């Protein structure tokens, strides 16, 4: 290629880059495809097209362009890695893993591939493999903010809190403006009076340059420190501030959309005849559902400690599937009117979902503790009649109190940071669970959190019997097992069951008015 061509290509790619930064992705694709005809061996052009398709949520199109690029540039690391990402976005994790490994065969120091393999193994709850890849990424570049955070989360999930704290301090030193580090530290630290970490947070909370996200991170972490110290007034003050500020980050939040979703579900299942669904699918699936902070993690640790089960943690398989199906009113009506009542269509859907669960482990019973699957119980009954559903039933005021004093990584939980919406959401959940119990009866096992922590052995035996599993001592001694946890309960699951969590909200009714709006009795 002569100098004129190189100069021309550089100018054109600069224009494409500007369009990409402006999020003009269709124009990026159009202009890049024109360039591709003249320069078919330039990896960066394929990457611009594929990455733009990612941004437009056209993952199949992205995969097509990256597979074409593989034919022309079979040893280009960026192409191989992006092909893996395309497969991962399409839930083909086996092919994704193969391409990430191909990248590392070409370039063992390819940082994005180590990170993506870490994410992939993390999604499959293969915590040791994930940790290895994050550690490799750390060894390649320990000055990367995201790499440090991934290592912290991975070590915390494994219960390696001392190692996690060391990297958090490293993150503090290298990226002092990152307030996420304070929140991460607070989750795995028990604060005592005059704790230096608390003093550090208090010294920067009034910095005028902090944005809403930074302020909420700090207030949640400070609230946790005062909660540990049993300083109720300061705990309440910072909890209120944390939630007030966090809610401001949810622009144009519309709670009515939540209410509509709940009503739609009940409407479509009101007169549905479940007994007609005879297909024998789901024997190797256990779903633990309930509100967040209702004891789902405890149940997951207990059941996943059994030799015949594999704990998938909070899998997004079910929720992602239905959220894609229900993009608009027409797609919802079509799903209920056509696919759900068509035996062949139902069988195809259940096989599609089941194949994704089998990626965790083909030989064991998969335990999915995504709490929000309570919304999809009717569908689970339809698609997996032999599955087991366990409802973690805790005093809803206790769950709500715990929700309000914690921050969640999930982006769509605006209701969790507003007292009025939180109370309404809990009551929506209660009504929907009552609806499912009325319609499905013993298909749902009610595990009462208060009974479980009061008599763990007796309740564990009942739960295992419902799951058609023999009792094993490991299920009672679950804290001795190395089952990873990536949820807010990451610190608590390493401790023995504690009864002090029962009626924990009672002393806070005067501080948080929304607790009075929640029905005392669980559904």
Spans of model-derived segments:
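Alpha-helical segment of the N-proximal tetratricopeptide repeat
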Residues: 8-38, 48-51, 55
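Conserved alpha-helical positions within TPR/SEL1-like repeat arrays
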Residues: 17, 21, 44-55, 78-89, ...
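PAPS-dependent sulfotransferases, especially Golgi type II membrane carbohydrate sulfotransferases
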Residues: 165, 186, 198-209, 219-285, ...
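Phosphate-binding active sites in nucleotide-utilizing proteins
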Residues: 279-382
């Amino acid at each position: 290629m002569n100098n004129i061509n190189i100069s021309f290509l550089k100018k054109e790619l600069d224009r494409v880059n500007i369009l990409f930064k402006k999020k003009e992705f269709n124009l990026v694709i159009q202009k890049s495809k024109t360039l591709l005809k003249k320069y078919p061996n330039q990896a960066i052009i394929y990457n611009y097209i594929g990455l733009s398709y990612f941004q437009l949520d056209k993952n199949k199109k992205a995969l097509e362009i990256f597979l074409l690029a593989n034919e022309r540039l079979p040893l280009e690391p960026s192409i191989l890695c992006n092909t893996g990402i395309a497969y991962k976005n399409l839930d083909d994790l086996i092919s994704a893993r193969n391409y990430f490994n191909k990248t590392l065969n070409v370039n063992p120091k390819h940082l994005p591939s180590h990170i993506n393999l870490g994410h992939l193994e993390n999604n499959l709850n293969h915590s040791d493999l994930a940790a290895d890849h994050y550690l490799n990424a750390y060894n390649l570049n320990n000055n990367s903010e995201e790499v440090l955070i991934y290592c912290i989360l991975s070590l915390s999930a494994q219960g390696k809190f001392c190692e996690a704290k060391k990297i958090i301090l490293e993150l503090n030193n290298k990226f002092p403006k990152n307030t996420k580090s304070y929140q991460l530290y607070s989750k795995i630290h028990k604060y005592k009076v005059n704790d230096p970490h608390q003093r550090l947070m208090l010294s920067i909370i009034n910095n005028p340059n902090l944005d809403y996200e930074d302020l909420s991170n700090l207030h949640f972490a400070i609230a946790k420190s005062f909660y540990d110290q049993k300083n109720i007034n300061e705990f309440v003050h910072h909890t209120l501030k944390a939630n007030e500020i966090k809610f401001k980050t949810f622009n144009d939040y519309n709670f009515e959309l939540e209410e509509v979703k709940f009503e739609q579900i009940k409407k479509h299942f009101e007169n549905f005849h479940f007994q007609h669904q005879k297909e024998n699918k789901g024997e190797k699936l256990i779903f633990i559902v309930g509100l967040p902070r209702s004891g789902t993690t405890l149940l997951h640790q207990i059941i996943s400690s059994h030799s015949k089960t594999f704990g998938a943690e909070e899998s997004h398989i079910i929720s992602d599937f239905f959220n894609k199906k229900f993009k608009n009113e027409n797609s919802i009506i079509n799903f209920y009117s056509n696919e759900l009542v068509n035996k062949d269509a139902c069988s195809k859907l259940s096989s599609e979902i089941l194949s994704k669960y089998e990626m965790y482990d083909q030989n064991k019973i998969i335990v999915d503790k995504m709490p929000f699957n309570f919304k999809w119980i009717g569908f689970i009954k339809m698609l997996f009649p032999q599955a087991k559903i366990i409802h973690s039933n805790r005093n809803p005021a206790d769950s709500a109190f715990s929700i309000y004093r914690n921050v969640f990584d999930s982006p769509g939980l605006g209701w969790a940071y507003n007292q009025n919406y939180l109370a309404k959401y809990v009551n929506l959940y209660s009504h929907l669970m009552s609806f499912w119990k009325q319609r499905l009866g013993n298909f749902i096992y009610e595990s009462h959190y208060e009974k479980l922590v009061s008599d763990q052995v007796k309740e564990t035996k009942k739960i295992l019997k419902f799951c058609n599993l023999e009792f094993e001592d490991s299920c009672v001694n679950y804290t001795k097992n190395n089952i990873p946890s990536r949820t807010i309960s990451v610190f608590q699951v390493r401790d023995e069951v504690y009864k002090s969590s029962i009626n924990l909200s009672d002393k806070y009714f005067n501080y948080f008015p929304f607790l009075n709006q929640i029905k005392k009795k669980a559904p």
